[in-house]
Amino acid sequence: MGKNFLNDFGLPAGAKFVCFTIRDSAYLDRHKANENFPSRSWKYHNYRDGDIDKYVLAAEELARRGYYILRMGVKVLKPLKSSNPKIIDYVNSAIRSSFMDIYLGAKCNFCISTATGFDDIPGIFRKPIAYSSLTPFGLTINHDEKSLILAKHHINKKFKRRLTVSEIFLSNVALCIKS
């Protein structure tokens, strides 16, 4: 079933592919209006969000290097804008499913993520994960030595400069879980 899906999206047998999972507010926002969370606001998670438009160049470069890119997720704010046939907005496809989420996470060459629940799937299958704009930095989970972690920039507004890694930890910003 999984191989048939890849074929349906135009991936030849044995093609290299990357799972892209860029967090935005859409996933949590869908819980606003249900009976379990009648007045719950998830805005305190907004500092963790990424903008998919800022990742298009990375996707294009990976496609140029021979990879297919599959954008993962359950619900997203906006589509991935690329006309490259190797860049697939799987999250917005009619054939997105939980089974395929697991299959893709297990079979990908690696994953690029801003830290979402999906990361656990490639992690369980020991796939390398490149974390981008990761925060909170002090709560980092590193699956193995093949993973890469790029922290979100932390800016000192008073001095108008980026904090060093040491300053992030010394100021306790590394463990902040709210904007």
For each feature predicted by the language model, list its residue ranges.
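Secretory-pathway luminal glycosyltransferase catalytic domains
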Residues: 1-43, 178-179
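Catalytic donor nucleotide-activated moiety binding site of glycosyltransferases and closely related
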Residues: 15-29, 50-97
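Short, glycine/acidic-rich beta->alpha junctions
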Residues: 47-54, 93-97, 103, 111-117
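Surface-exposed alpha-helical segments enriched in charged/polar residues
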Residues: 7, 56-60, 103-106
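Charge-rich alpha-helical segments
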Residues: 2-6, 43-53, 67, 129-131, ...
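A donor-sugar binding/catalytic signature common to diverse glycosyltransferases
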Residues: 101-147
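Leloir-type glycosyltransferase catalytic cores
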Residues: 1-8, 145-179
